[in-house]
Amino acid sequence: MRILYLLLSVLFVVLQGVAGQPYFSSPIHACRYQRGVCIPGPCRWPYYRVGSCGSGLKSCCVRNRWA
């Protein structure tokens, strides 16, 4: 009977970990969610970098609001 309580507590821990997973399946989707575009290399004006896409060779760039 004790094993059931242990398994139930492990199940709750696993479910809490799954609930904390990000919704986005890839960095490209996360970049699009921020209204950004993936550009190879550094961001150029009027864009600025907010992150990276994939392997880090591409930058997630967002257009500057004041340009």
UniProtKB/Swiss-Prot annotation:
Protein name: Gallinacin-6
Subcellular locations according to the entry: Secreted; Cytoplasmic granule
Species in which this protein is naturally found: Gallus gallus
Keywords annotated in UniProt: Antibiotic, Antimicrobial, Defensin, Disulfide bond, Secreted, Signal
Family of the protein in this entry: Belongs to the beta-defensin family.
Gene Ontology terms: biological process: cell chemotaxis; defense response to bacterium
InterPro entries the record matches: Defensin_beta-like (IPR001855)
Disulfide bond positions: C31-C60, C38-C53, C43-C61
GO cellular component, one term: extracellular space
Propeptide residue range(s): 20-25
Highest taxon, organism lineage: Eukaryota
